[in-house]
């Protein structure tokens, strides 16, 4: 045995070196423990959020009780409906001087409209002048609307006066020059045993004798228009008021959100927009078909608001929400799913839901037989937003809105 061999035999055992491999089991164990903690925390958080949500879905009442509605596939946005930006060529008028000019009428070149703060105003020489108010203030929030009033449909009569329907107050005649207001029919007056909760639009015969108007619902008020649309309540009516006899007749009942109305040029029928059914109904008021009704046009490319005469002998129809095709229409999707609509309005306010509705404004011109003639678009609602009416006068379209702080004018 050599000395070296002896030294090798007597060499003490080397201390074990701690390496990464040696730590691996401990690290894996720590990782496993951390993973369990993360999963447990995640599950607790999910339960913390889910249980109240489920409780809300079970315990909270939905403000609506919708029925399933079925629509045809929307018309393709091709040809006459090909998207364009023509509405973006419009100019804004009276910006930040008024809000929500829903409907427009003219006497000569003087324009009139109703606003969200309950006023009827005259628009002349760049100035906004209040000529009537049917309610009383304050007029700042949706809760104020019933007391404040909300003028909607407005028409010029034959004697230099205006006929105005207020969603909450009733049917009025206004002398804009003398600022005189006459109540023709109070919304508090029950018609055939039912109240009028949401007066909307009107059209007047040339002699001023008959006024045809819509009551969108006997259940919902204007401030809850989105709930009415989502529920699709069939309690809307088309009515007739005789300015001489003061008699009121129900012409059509069981309408789902009737909105705009327009007499034909010959005054033999009245067109009434049925917003929740994306169609326009026709009721005959004279001639061989008197008392009869049919569908004038159905399966519109959007949800129609007001309807007004065009210089071509047809009609302008305004739409603040479209049924995109190709594309996706949330309102069409929800129409056949009442449970989803109930859940949405259990959890979210109308104002929150409105934020998810694309601001696509569409104005459609119809022929006298209901065929599509042309369409004007603002795909992003950049200029014309929440469009409610297209009123033609002297080669221009005056474009109303139920929310915008201005009026728009487009040269045709």
UniProtKB/Swiss-Prot annotation:
InterPro entries: 6-blade_b-propeller_TolB-like (IPR011042), Strictosidine_synth_cons-reg (IPR018119). The keyword tRNA processing does not apply. Residues 1-39 are cytoplasmic. SUPFAM superfamilies: Calcium-dependent phosphotriesterase (SSF63829). Pfam families: SSL_N, Str_synth. It is a single-pass type II membrane protein. Its main location: membrane. It comes from the Eukaryota. The modification Phosphothreonine is found at residue 19. One of its GO terms (molecular function) is arylesterase activity. Residues 61-412 are extracellular. Residues 1-32 are annotated as: Disordered. GO terms for cellular component: membrane. Glycans are attached at residue 159. Keywords: Glycoprotein, Membrane, Phosphoprotein, Signal-anchor, Transmembrane, Transmembrane helix. It is found in: Membrane. The chain crosses the membrane at residues 40-60. Exhibits strong arylesterase activity with beta-naphthyl acetate and phenyl acetate. May play a role in adipocyte differentiation. Belongs to the strictosidine synthase family. This is Adipocyte plasma membrane-associated protein. It comes from Bos taurus (Bovine). The lineage of its organism: Eukaryota, Metazoa, Chordata, Craniata, Vertebrata. The gene is APMAP.
């Amino acid at each position: 045995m050599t000395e070296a061999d002896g030294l090798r035999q007597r060499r003490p055992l080397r201390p074990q070196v701690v390496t990464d491999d040696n730590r691996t089991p401990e690290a894996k164990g720590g990782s496993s423990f951390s993973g369990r903690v993360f999963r447990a925390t995640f599950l607790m958080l999910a339960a913390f959020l889910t249980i109240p949500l489920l409780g809300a879905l079970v315990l909270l009442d939905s403000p609506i009780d919708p029925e399933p509605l079925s629509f045809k596939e929307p018309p393709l946005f091709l040809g006459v409906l090909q998207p364009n930006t023509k509405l973006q060529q419009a100019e804004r008028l009276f910006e930040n001087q008024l809000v929500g000019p829903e409907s427009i009428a003219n006497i000569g070149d003087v324009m009139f409209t109703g606003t969200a703060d309950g006023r009827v105003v005259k628009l002349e020489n760049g100035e906004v002048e209040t000529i009537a108010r049917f309610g009383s203030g304050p007029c700042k929030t949706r809760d104020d609307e019933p007391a404040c009033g909300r003028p909607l449909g407005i028409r010029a009569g034959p004697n230099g006066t205006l006929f105005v329907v207020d969603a909450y107050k009733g049917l009025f005649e206004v002398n804009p020059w003398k600022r005189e207001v006459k109540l023709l029919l109070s919304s508090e007056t029950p018609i055939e045993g039912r109240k009028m909760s949401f007066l909307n639009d009107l059209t007047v015969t040339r002699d001023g004798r008959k006024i045809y108007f819509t009551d969108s619902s006997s259940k919902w008020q204007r401030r809850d228009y989105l709930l009415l649309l989502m529920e699709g309540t069939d309690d809307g009516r088309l009515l007739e008021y005789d300015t001489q006899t003061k008699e009121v007749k129900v012409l059509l009942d069981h309408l789902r959100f009737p909105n705009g109305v327009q007499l034909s040029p010959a005054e033999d029928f009245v067109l009434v927009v049925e917003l929740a059914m994306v169609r326009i109904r026709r009721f005959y008021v004279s001639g061989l078909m008197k008392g009869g009704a049919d569908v004038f046009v159905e399966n519109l490319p959007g949800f129609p608001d007001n309807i007004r005469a065009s210089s071509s002998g047809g009609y302008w129809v305004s739409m603040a929400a479209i049924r995109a095709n190709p594309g996706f229409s949330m309102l069409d999707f929800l129409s056949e799913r009442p449970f989803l609509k109930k859940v949405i309005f259990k959890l979210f306010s109308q104002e929150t839901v409105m934020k998810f509705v694309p601001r696509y404004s569409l104005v459609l011109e119809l022929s006298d037989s209901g065929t599509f003639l042309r369409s004007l678009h603002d795909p992003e609602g950049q200029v014309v937003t929440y469009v409610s009416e297209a009123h033609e006068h002297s080669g221009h379209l005056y474009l109303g809105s139920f929310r915008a702080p201005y009026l728009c004018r487009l040269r045709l």
